[in-house]
């Protein structure tokens, strides 16, 4: 109401003052002067000025030339410039601005103006218009194109939407600077843009423009262009020849689009180029050789494309390079020695290619290098010593085949290095003690190597270290007592080594520690109480050691602890009180001597064998008289004790032999019955098959509800040699229950998916296996992968299902190739709703009720229309009785972030709500594009916690996946995020059912989603 009243007042004031100005008698100058005063007063009337910057503006003055932020022409006393940048003003740009008929410069940037800009269309003398970084909206009016004097137009960082009219550039012959970046503009770039013939800077980045921008007939004709930025749109097509016409071009930024094809060969004929960024597109082919002519180029980024061929030997000719990024392509070959000519190079990133050979020592000549990233290639040989003489800040050689030892380094490197990652190589020798001299080191990762040495105690001197990762590096000796001298350490991982001794008390000094993993070593002694000082600790992994004693009860006071694993040690006693310990999964404490709940009355039961006690005095000499025992002498005593032991052994042996005979007899009978069942089952399953006594080891392919001929060549070949079709070429995926292949076993040779099940926990009885598969095959729903049959032998269990050729959600969301466009919001919503419907069917319609237990992106397959299909449902039914307690089966608990809290507690009843939790995590992944748990250099982020905090702070929109480029409806995204947080509630009863979730999602997609979400 207040806004409407203010608008009405300003409109009335505008009309009144306009009429007054027209009635004023006097000379012309007086009338013109009053127009400027009155226009600014009307303009001010629609503004909120919290800091009173415009206090000097008053209608009592005859001229505004003395007002703050106003400039006048000294000859005419007309307002020519109004600059209100960064004054925290809010409001709208009203028609009062139209009174400033001589205005040349209007700059209102970095405020919070809202509404449209239609009032600016009649300022015919305007030369500079800067409205950047406000909250203006609506379409950009084509009438701006009628301002022929306009030279500078900056609308960056607003909320303008819609398409650009061709008329906008009909009269732009004076325009030199144009920036419309960071808006919501869409459609094609107008073909009339070429009429801006003197344009030297064009920035249309971070919008939703699509199609091909008509380079030949449009942009390539802007011959005075010096800066071109079309990045972060959805532009596509190839880049044609003709860029050489932009002789003055200095900056070319086309990154984060969908351009494809080869790079234009004449790009190297723009001699003044100093910045080229073509990253994150679909460019292919080899790098044009003309690039070597770009002597002035200092920033060159073609990362995340499909470029191939050998690494260019002419790279050394581009002597001006400061930043070079060829990462995530398919480049091959060796690094040429000419790379040493890049004496100005500071940042080199060649990661994730197929480069091979040794790291050239000639790179040592690039004395200005600060960042070198060569990870994920096939480099071999030693690390050149000279690298450790440079002033590098970051060195990442991980994921190669490097051998030899780590160079010791120099004083220059000691003072500069911040991040060192040599993980996943084959390095040997000792970790040099000089590592403690890297005074600014924050991240050190030497994991997955073959050092076979001690952890250097000098690590304690790394006072700024936040991440120390020495996993699986064949380390020996003890954990250094002062390893936690650094108060900054947040992640400490020493698991998978051969460390001995006790866990030092000093580890409790790591006050910032969030992850501590010492698992799979040979550590002994008790768990130190000092661990209770680690108030920031979230993950504690001590499994597979030889730790003894009780778990300190003080650990129950750690409020941030989320995950604990102390399995396979020698621990006894009660678990500490505290939420995380009360909900521990059995697998997290198994393999100890005796751990029990603190709520249990009486002592904990120890899991140790009872000793055999033999009392030598319990067997007498007949009359059991002490005198007779004494007269027998010591020889008689020992002989009688020996005889007593012999009698026990003989009796025990007889019992064992007798029991063995009975067991073998029973087993033979059981085997005969099972073989008879198998023969009968196979004969009944396959009509027309002969009773030939086919070997059970050969197996049979059972296709349920199929018309495929049993005599088809593919089926017969598969039965004779199933492993022949299950090879690397046909492999399409891998999960916790086995590897998935595709094989032409369906009707007319159609491909089916074949999961080779991990044998150990799977039902070993054909009768049971057949029954459970037939139950699962009855589950029919558009959002479920249908089960087609199975193949069974005692040694090989295969589950045959529908083949979905479009891959899984993991590959589309987290492992997307540069050639694959990101998932749109509409597709993501379709996946969310379809997955919900599939789970609702399993929970509420299908009988028996089926819990998935393992919902995650790898188990969501997508068909050719991106419809989701849930796979791996019901696999818990195929577990043996021993493994059938699914809630305690760590096969279903692959990663922190997916597992519902109740799955970690052996005493809680688990129901369908654990799937609801996993579904909530899946929603968060789809909306944010992030993984459930993300590890950074200094810490890790749990996605559900992060989104919940951002929602409480009112910044939840910052969580949304940026690759969607804001092409989504907030009215859908926000309720979906809130629904996800409700689904991931720690208390199962607070989560909705999947049937309710389907209804909520369907309502969210309607015009009034708040009706449902207001109840959350």
Curated annotation (Swiss-Prot):
One Pfam short name: LRR_8
Residue stretches of each LRR repeat: 102-124, 125-147, 149-171, 174-196, 198-219, 224-245, 248-270, 272-295, 296-318, 320-342, 344-366, 368-390, 391-413, 416-438, 440-462, 464-486, 488-510, 512-535, 536-559, 560-582
Coiled coil segments of this chain: none
Binding site for ATP: 732-740, 755
Superkingdom of the organism of origin: Eukaryota
Record: glycosylation sites: 112, 135, 171, 203, 349, 445, 464, 509, 522, 565
Any single GO CC term annotated in Swiss-Prot or TrEMBL for this entry: membrane
Location of Phosphotyrosine modifications: 841, 898
InterPro entries, alphabetized: Kinase-like_dom_sf, Leu-rich_rpt, Leu-rich_rpt_typical-subtyp, LRR_dom_sf, LRR_N_plant-typ, LRR_R13L4/SHOC2-like, Plant_LRR-RLKs, Prot_kinase_dom
Extracellular side: 27-646
Residue ranges of domain Protein kinase in the record: 726-1013
Keyword Transferase in record: no
PANTHER family reported in the protein's UniProt record: LRR RECEPTOR-LIKE SERINE/THREONINE-PROTEIN KINASE-RELATED, PROTEIN KINASE DOMAIN-CONTAINING PROTEIN
Entry remark concerning the domains of this protein: The protein kinase domain is predicted to be catalytically inactive. Lacks the conserved Asp active site at position 854, which is replaced by an Asn residue.
Family: Belongs to the protein kinase superfamily. Ser/Thr protein kinase family.
Protein name: Probably inactive leucine-rich repeat receptor-like protein kinase At3g28040
Lineage: Eukaryota, Viridiplantae, Streptophyta, Embryophyta, Tracheophyta
């Amino acid at each position: 109401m207040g806004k409407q009243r203010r608008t009405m007042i300003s409109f009335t004031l505008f009309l009144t003052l306009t009429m007054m100005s027209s009635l004023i008698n006097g000379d012309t100058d007086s009338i013109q002067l009053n127009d400027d005063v009155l226009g600014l007063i009307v303009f001010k009337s629609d503004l909120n000025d919290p800091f009173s910057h415009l206090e000097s503006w008053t209608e009592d003055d005859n001229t505004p030339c003395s007002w703050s932020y106003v400039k006048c022409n000294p000859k005419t006393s007309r307002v020519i410039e109004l600059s209100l940048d960064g004054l925290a003003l809010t409001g709208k740009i009203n028609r009062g601005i139209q009174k400033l008929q001589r205005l040349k410069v209007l700059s209102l940037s970095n405020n919070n103006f809202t509404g449209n800009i239609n009032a600016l269309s009649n300022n015919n003398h305007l030369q500079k218009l800067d409205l950047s970084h406000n909250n203006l909206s609506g379409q950009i009016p084509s009438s701006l194109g009628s301002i022929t004097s306009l030279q500078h137009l900056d609308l960056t960082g607003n909320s303008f939407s819609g398409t650009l009219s061709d008329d906008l550039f009909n009269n732009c012959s004076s325009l030199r600077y144009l920036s419309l970046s960071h808006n919501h503009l869409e459609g094609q770039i107008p073909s009339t843009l070429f009429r801006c013939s003197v344009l030297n800077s064009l920035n249309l980045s971070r919008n939703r423009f699509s199609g091909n921008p008509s380079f030949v007939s449009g942009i390539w004709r802007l011959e005075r262009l010096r800066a071109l930025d079309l990045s972060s749109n959805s532009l596509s097509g190839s880049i044609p020849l003709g860029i050489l016409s932009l002789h003055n071009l200095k900056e070319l930024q086309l990154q984060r689009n969908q351009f494809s094809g080869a790079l234009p060969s004449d790009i190297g004929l723009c001699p003044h180029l100093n910045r080229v960024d073509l990253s994150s597109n679909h460019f292919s082919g080899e790098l044009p050789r003309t690039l070597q002519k770009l002597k002035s180029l200092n920033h060159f980024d073609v990362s995340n494309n499909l470029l191939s061929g050998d690494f260019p030997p002419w790279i050394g000719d581009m002597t001006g390079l400061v930043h070079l990024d060829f990462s995530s392509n398919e480049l091959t070959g060796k690094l040429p020695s000419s790379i040493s000519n890049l004496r100005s190079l500071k940042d080199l990133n060649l990661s994730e290619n197929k480069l091979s050979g040794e790291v050239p020592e000639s790179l040592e000549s690039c004395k200005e290098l600060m960042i070198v990233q060569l990870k994920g290639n096939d480099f071999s040989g030693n690390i050149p010593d000279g690298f450790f003489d440079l002033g590098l800040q970051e060195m990442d050689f991980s994921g190669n085949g490097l051998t030899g030892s780590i160079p010791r380094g120099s004083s220059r490197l000691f003072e500069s290095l911040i991040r060192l990652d040599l993980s996943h190589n084959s390095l040997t020798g000792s970790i040099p003690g000089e590592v403690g001299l890297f005074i600014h080191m924050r991240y050190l990762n030497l994991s997955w190597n073959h050092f076979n040495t001690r952890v250097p105690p000098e690590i304690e001197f790394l006072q700024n270290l936040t991440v120390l990762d020495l996993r699986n590096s064949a380390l020996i000796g003890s954990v250094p007592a002062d390893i936690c001298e650094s108060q900054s350490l947040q992640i400490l991982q020493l698991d998978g080594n051969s460390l001995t001794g006790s866990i030092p008390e000093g580890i409790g000094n790591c006050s910032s520690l969030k992850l501590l993993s010492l698992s799979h070593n040979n550590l002994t002694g008790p768990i130190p109480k000092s661990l209770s000082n680690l108030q920031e600790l979230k993950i504690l992994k001590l499994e597979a050691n030889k730790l003894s004693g009780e778990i300190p009860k003080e650990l129950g006071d750690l409020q941030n602890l989320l995950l604990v694993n102390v399995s396979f040690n020698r621990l006894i006693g009660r678990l500490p009180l505290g939420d995380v310990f009360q909900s521990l999964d059995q697998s997290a404490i198994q393999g100890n001597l005796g751990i029990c709940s603190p709520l249990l009355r009486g002592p904990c039961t120890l899991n140790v064998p009872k000793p055999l006690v033999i009392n030598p005095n319990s067997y007498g000499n007949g009359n059991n008289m002490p005198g007779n025992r004494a007269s027998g002498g010591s020889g008689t005593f020992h002989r009688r004790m020996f005889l007593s032991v012999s009698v026990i052994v003989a009796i025990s042996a007889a019992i064992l032999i007798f029991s063995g005979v009975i067991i073998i007899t029973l087993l033979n009978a059981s085997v005969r019955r099972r073989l008879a069942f198998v023969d009968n089952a196979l004969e009944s399953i396959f009509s027309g098959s002969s009773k030939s006594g086919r070997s059970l080891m050969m197996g049979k392919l059972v296709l349920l509800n199929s018309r495929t001929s049993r005599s088809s060549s593919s089926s017969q070949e598969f039965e004779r040699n199933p492993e022949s079709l299950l090879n690397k070429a046909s492999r399409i995926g891998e999960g916790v229950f086995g590897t998935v292949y595709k094989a032409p076993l369906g009707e007319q040779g159609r491909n089916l998916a074949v999961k080779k099940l991990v044998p150990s926990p799977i039902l070993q009885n054909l009768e049971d296996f057949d029954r459970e598969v037939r139950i699962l095959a009855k589950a029919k729903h558009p959002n479920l992968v249908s089960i087609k049959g199975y193949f069974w032998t005692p040694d090989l269990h295969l589950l045959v299902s529908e083949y979905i050729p479009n891959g899984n959600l993991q590959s589309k969301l987290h492992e997307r190739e540069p050639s694959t466009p990101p998932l749109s919001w509409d597709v993501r919503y379709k996946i969310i709703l379809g997955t919900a419907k599939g789970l609702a069917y399993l929970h509420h319609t299908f009988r028996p009720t089926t819990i998935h237990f393992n919902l995650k992106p790898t188990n969501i397959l997508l068909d050719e229309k991106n419809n989701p299909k849930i796979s791996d449902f019901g696999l818990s039914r195929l577990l043996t009785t021993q493994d059938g307690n699914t809630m305690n089966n760590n096969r279903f608990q692959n990663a922190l972030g997916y597992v519902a809290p109740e799955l970690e507690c052996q005493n809680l009843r688990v129901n369908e709500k654990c799937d609801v939790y996993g579904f909530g995590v899946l929603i968060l992944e789809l909306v944010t594009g992030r993984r459930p748990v993300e590890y950074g250099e200094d810490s890790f982020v749990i996605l559900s916690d992060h989104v919940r905090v951002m929602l409480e702070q009112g910044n939840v929109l910052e969580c949304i996946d940026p690759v969607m480029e804001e092409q989504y409806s907030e009215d859908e995204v926000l309720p979906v995020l809130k629904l996800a947080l409700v689904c991931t509630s720690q208390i199962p009863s607070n989560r909705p059912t999947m049937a309710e979730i389907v209804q909520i999602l369907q309502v969210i997609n309607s015009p009034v989603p708040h009706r449902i979400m207001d109840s959350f």
